[in-house]
Design a protein with these regions (language model features):
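Short, low-complexity, charged amphipathic interaction modules
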Residues: 1-15
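Short domain-boundary/entry signatures in modular proteins, especially
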Residues: 13-19, 203
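Short beta-strand-centered segments at strand-helix junctions
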Residues: 21, 26-67, 74-119, 124-151, ...
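Short coil-to-beta-strand transition motifs
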Residues: 163-165
Length: 203
């Protein structure tokens, strides 16, 4: 049975079809900011593994405060990073009164600002808020099969009841990646994504 499943998954992958995952608003914390928000010696408590190996949803939550509003119980994804990064949808930014650029994850220089509130402290994040560029995580063997390269831009057609073709989708290749496409809730709602959904990579 497992061999049959592997053959089916392989056939889907060779067709350039990728599972689409929807990312809600979340934050990645630096070790320093983690200690400020949750107290000295605090660490993240894994709650559920994510599709990308080594990444997880934590038990801990924070509040985000903008000039027009706040979002409570915002998810923290682990493990900790070298710098704090907040990923919001455009709708989130409008509701919070935050200005954030469309960026690749990790590119936070000159990005948006926000206040992050935890149970033990608050940080005024002067930069680090972005609207994440939609992207596809690709392991090297899949990249070779589909002739994809790291940093390449492609189009992806969302195979839903309201099909949409996203242009300028970023390809990210790494040996630790699982083959998945990530979009935010604004994009998912526009394409009527509901449950298991595939996207077709178009070069």
């Amino acid at each position: 049975m497992q061999n049959l499943m592997d053959q089916i998954v392989g056939a889907i992958t060779r067709s350039g079809l990728v599972e689409v995952e929807v990312s809600a608003r979340h934050i990645h914390l630096s070790e320093r900011d983690m200690q400020i928000l949750f107290g000295d010696g605090a660490s993240l408590t894994p709650k559920r593994d994510l599709s990308q190996p080594g990444q997880y949803l934590s038990e801990e939550r924070v509040n985000l405060i903008g000039t027009k509003g706040r979002k409570e119980h915002v998810a923290i994804l682990g493990p900790v990073r070298s710098s704090t990064q907040v990923e919001l949808s455009k709708s989130d930014c409008v509701e919070l009164g935050v200005t954030a650029p469309l960026r690749e994850s990790g590119d936070v220089k000159g990005s948006g600002s926000i206040i992050v509130e935890g149970p033990c402290g608050t940080i005024n994040l002067t930069e680090g808020v972005i609207i994440a560029q939609n992207h596809v995580h690709v392991p090297p063997e899949t990249a070779q099969m589909l002739e994809l390269k790291d940093k390449q831009r492609v189009c992806v057609e969302i195979m839903s009841e309201r099909p949409i073709i996203f242009k300028n989708v970023l390809i990210r290749v790494h040996k630790n990646f699982t083959f998945r496409m990530h979009i935010d809730f604004d994009e998912a709602n526009a394409a009527a994504v509901n449950g298991f959904t595939l996207g077709k990579i178009i070069k």
